[in-house]
Amino acid sequence: MSNNIQQHIDFSISTYCQAKCRSCQRTNQDTGEPEDWLIPSHMSYDLFNSMMDKTPDTLRVIQFCGELGDPMMHPDITKFVDRALSKESIKHLVINTNGGLRNPEWYTNMGLKYGSKILLQFGIDGITHDTNWKYREGVDFAKAWDNMIASSKTDIDLEWHFLIFKWNWQEVTEAANLAKK
């Protein structure tokens, strides 16, 4: 058996999200509210810490994914980041976010503290508030944009995930040009 079996673990640390993306499985397409089956919760730090204590030394990447919520909604996100990156074997922490939470100072501080050990994946689907809102309803575009720009001024690894829809495809070229800056 290979020693490389457990190199990446994805933690869903929160089911809270301020966005009302109509095609997200957590959102009722008609109302924009969370589905009735969704139980809003944050993973406890004690549980995460216990799991981290049990992870193998072959673990290289931890991801905080936004499958049912945005990790940045977690009130203890900073503690989670610090704990994840305290494990010597961890080379990268990947965080998916719509970007509309926290503030530029938080992202700058994480960049200064951890640099390229963090990969932030910002889900911003337009270059204007109106375009982004068509899918990511509930997300403050200006805040998301400012947070992404603040991150880009540090050594954080950054990816802009721009989902293409019929209402934003015409912005792809301009978005690509902005991403190069």
Give residue ranges: language-model regions:
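Conserved alpha-helical substructure of the radical SAM core
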Residues: M1-L119, D130-A142, D146
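Phosphate/oxyanion-binding loops and surfaces in catalytic or ligand/nucleic-acid-binding neighborhoods
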Residues: T27, T154, L178
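A short alpha-helix capping/helix-coil boundary motif
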Residues: T58-V61, D125-T128, K153-I156
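Short, electropositive alpha-helical surface patch
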Residues: D76-A84, Q121-I124, W169-K181
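Secondary-structure boundary elements
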Residues: K87, K153-T154, K181
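Conserved strand-turn element in the central/C-terminal portion of the radical SAM core barrel
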Residues: L93, M148-E171
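Short beta->alpha connector loops
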Residues: T97-R102, G126, I164-N168
